[in-house]
């Protein structure tokens, strides 16, 4: 029985068993398609095409020789230029180009007629023909010959204004200048006066805006009218007696010999002109010996805008005249002063030269004269003027342009020979030197005394 079995059949069975085992060991999943088949669900990672994987031999990235150029799906005539590198020549134009050429030749023939009509109506010269002398059939000819001027935009040039706008801007500028010129007339007048006048008349010209005081004479006795250039309420009016007393003492120490030669004359300064214009009837009389008098009535000053304050080196004219006329010992108000109002300042004692600081520290002519007051009259008292000397007058005139001009005049003498001792009887404190004849003071002496007083005031302010 064993011999009847065929060995070939046994071998076939082993091959079948091995194939079954291989099939069982294989993983469960989709089976790879054969190489001839393409699966659209697959995508190659190398070339990005669908239908094969990166391991397939159909991928063109692995075998370039087998790669084929992808063909189009279908031809679309009339939308694609199959041969763009071959431009059509002018020798053999196509049918479409022939039609276009005929349409272009027709309007070109009408151009000369149009140009002639335009030349007749507009008067412009005819355009010159092209130098080549043949019609331009190239498509880029319209770029070479422009039909009209092209606008050129530049940022460097400024646009021109209309004449109406220019006139308006000019009127606005002139209006602004006139408004600025009319804003501060006080400041303009003070600047023009200070620039035109000399060093002697600058500070007097600064008071051109204040009203000019009038000289008031009561009875036979002339009064000294002093107008300070810079008025200040309360504090500014109280500084005047102190400067007056200080100047009297300095002048006494500087010129002791002049006091021996000249008699002591009692002079009465008139109150400032603002009291007359405001209607105040109070008289101010200051003594030369005291630093500050007793409570004097405060002058009602006009509050002008932006006026500089009275400096320490500026000396009123009333203090200067008192020292020039012989250093009066006491000041007694005349009977005419009682008519204006009660005098509240008491009589001050004489200040000795020992109490006055020396003036030899500074030369007298080191600084030019800076007068700060405008004196209308400068005269001796009529009771003491026995030699016939005439008083001095300073005349101030206001010009058309707002400036001031001053001139020194000799006024007629105010003598009272009928009653030579009338005023001397009323003032019991007059010294024995008043019996001597009065000596006339020349203007040069007054100018030197004013320089001495200004230099001494500067030295005192520096020491303080």
Curated annotation (Swiss-Prot):
UniProt signal peptide: none
Residue ranges, annotated region (Disordered): 1-42, 69-389, 411-437
Cross-referenced InterPro entries: FAM90, Znf-CCHC_6
Biased composition, class Basic and acidic residues, residue ranges: 74-89, 97-114
Name of the protein in its database record: Protein FAM90A13
Taxonomic lineage: Eukaryota, Metazoa, Chordata, Craniata, Vertebrata
Pfam (any one): zf-CCHC_6
Similarity-based family: Belongs to the FAM90 family.
Miscellaneous comment text of the record: Primate-specific FAM90A gene family, thought to have arisen during multiple duplication and rearrangement events.
Biased composition (Low complexity): 180-197
């Amino acid at each position: 029985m064993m011999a009847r079995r065929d060995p070939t059949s046994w071998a076939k069975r082993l091959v079948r068993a091995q194939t079954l085992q291989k099939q069982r060991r294989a993983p469960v999943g989709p089976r790879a398609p054969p190489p001839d088949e393409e699966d659209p669900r697959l995508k190659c990672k190398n070339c990005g095409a669908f239908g094969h994987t990166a391991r397939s031999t159909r991928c063109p990235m692995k075998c370039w020789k087998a790669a084929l150029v992808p063909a189009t799906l279908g031809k679309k005539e009339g939308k694609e230029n199959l041969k763009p590198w071959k431009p059509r020549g002018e020798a053999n134009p196509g049918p479409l180009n022939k039609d276009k050429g005929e349409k272009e030749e027709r309007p070109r023939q009408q151009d000369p007629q149009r140009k002639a009509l335009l030349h007749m109506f507009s008067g412009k010269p005819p355009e010159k023909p092209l130098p080549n002398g043949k019609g331009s059939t190239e498509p880029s000819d319209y770029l070479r010959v422009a039909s009209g001027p092209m606008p050129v935009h530049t940022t460097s040039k400024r646009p021109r204004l209309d004449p109406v706008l220019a006139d308006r801007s000019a009127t606005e500028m002139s209006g602004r200048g006139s408004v600025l010129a009319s804003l501060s007339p006080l400041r303009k007048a003070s600047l023009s006066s200070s620039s035109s006048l000399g060093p002697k008349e600058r500070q007097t010209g600064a008071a051109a805006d204040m009203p000019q005081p009038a000289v008031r004479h009561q009875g036979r006795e002339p009064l000294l009218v002093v107008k300070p250039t810079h008025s200040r309420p309360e504090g500014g009016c109280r500084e005047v007696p102190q400067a007056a007393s200080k100047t009297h003492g300095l002048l006494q120490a500087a010129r002791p010999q002049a006091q021996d030669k000249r008699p002591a004359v009692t002079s009465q300064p008139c109150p400032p002109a603002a009291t007359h214009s405001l209607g105040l009837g109070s008289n101010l009389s200051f003594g030369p010996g005291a630093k500050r008098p007793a409570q004097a009535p405060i002058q009602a000053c006009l509050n002008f805008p932006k006026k500089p304050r009275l400096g320490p080196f500026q000396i009123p004219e009333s203090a200067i005249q008192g020292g020039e006329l012989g250093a009066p010992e006491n000041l007694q108000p005349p009977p005419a002063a009682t008519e204006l109002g009660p005098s509240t300042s008491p009589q001050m004692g004489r200040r000795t030269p020992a109490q006055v600081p020396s003036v030899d520290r500074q030369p007298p002519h080191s600084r030019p004269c800076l007068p700060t007051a405008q004196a209308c009259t400068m005269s001796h008292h009529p009771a003491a003027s026995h030699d016939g000397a005439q008083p001095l007058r300073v005349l101030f005139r206001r010009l058309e342009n707002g400036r001031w001009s001053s001139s020194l005049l000799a006024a007629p003498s105010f003598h009272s020979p009928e009653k030579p001792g009338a005023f001397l009887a009323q003032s019991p404190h007059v010294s024995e030197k008043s019996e001597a004849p009065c000596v006339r003071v020349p203007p040069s002496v007054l100018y030197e005394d004013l320089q001495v007083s200004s230099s001494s005031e500067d030295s005192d302010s520096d020491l303080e």
